[in-house]
Design a protein with these regions (language model features):
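A generic structural signal for short hydrophobic patches within well-formed alpha-helices
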Residues: 15-18, 156-157
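Generic beta-structure capping elements
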Residues: 10-13, 152-154, 213
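Catalytic cores of nucleic-acid endonucleases
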Residues: 190-191, 214-224
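A short helix-turn-beta junction within AAA+ P-loop NTPase domains corresponding to the substrate/partner-engaging
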Residues: 1-16
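Amphipathic alpha-helical "lid/sensor" segments that cap RecA-like P-loop NTPase cores
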Residues: 24-62
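Accessory nucleic acid-recognition modules appended to NTPase machines
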Residues: 48-207
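Short, polar/flexible loop-turn hinges at active-site or ligand-entry regions and domain interfaces
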Residues: 17-27, 42-47, 67-74
Length: 224
């Protein structure tokens, strides 16, 4: 008789949890630090950016590459790593499996669309990414609408930037999405003829429309 077990998801720390944790260890943290490097608490064992990056890269290699490659017996390791990196650096963006395949096939000539779809499923099953659909009053229509991908932690994006040009806007949107999940909201996207709202969050029969912006200096951002 096989043993019984209960599976539950453990997420990186929310911003509130990071503040509480840093208070306990007498360590200062700024909001921007969290927007860039996220909520894995063990990173605070390191005092400089380079050491923090090395730790997070090692963590990523262990969780994403080593574990998943072994678990799913992935043969096309180079292609898998390129696809994973492409996905993680494009968090908080509209995507489809076809668009990912189109962008990656120049680097991986022998990769098929079905393989890209499989790799996406592996990342979702491992809780590395979340995929959320566009809101629709008709459930069947969700299949034809676009989706967005959000990373379990924004550090997976920041590890891939060049010249310290961190993707603050998309990371901030990613953090808001994760915070909504922590708080128990059901989250979807909304786009009606180009009138986009980042999130429709529902909980206890209440609906909240949420637009995320790092700055509203841009007129289009302000109008939205």
């Amino acid at each position: 008789m096989s043993g019984r077990f209960v599976s539950f998801r453990i997420r990186p720390f929310s911003y509130k949890e990071i503040l509480e944790f840093c208070n306990e260890i007498n360590r200062e943290i700024t909001p921007m630090d969290y927007v860039i490097w996220g909520g894995f608490p063990a990173r605070f064992n390191f005092n400089d950016v380079e050491s923090t990056k090395l730790y997070l890269e090692d963590l990523e290699n262990t969780i994403i590459f080593n574990d998943l490659i072994k678990r799913y017996n992935i043969k096309k390791i180079i292609a898998f790593k390129k696809i994973v990196s492409y996905i993680l650096m494009n968090n908080s963006r509209v995507y489809s499996s076809r668009s990912i395949h189109k962008n990656i096939k120049n680097q991986c000539e022998n990769i098929s669309l079905n393989t890209v779809i499989k790799y996406l499923e592996y990342l979702k099953e491992a809780y590395i990414i979340d995929e959320i659909p566009q809101y629709s009053t008709k459930a069947k229509k969700e299949l034809s609408y676009y989706c967005k991908i959000y990373n379990a932690d924004v550090c997976f994006n920041s590890l891939r930037v060049n010249n310290n040009r961190y993707d603050i806007d998309h990371n901030l949107e990613n953090i808001v999405y994760n915070e909504l999940l922590y708080m128990g909201y059901n989250v979807k996207l909304y786009d009606n003829a180009g009138k986009e709202i980042d999130f429709i969050a529902t909980k206890n029969n209440k609906v909240f429309l949420i637009q995320v912006a790092y700055s509203v200096v841009d007129e289009k951002a302000y109008q939205r």
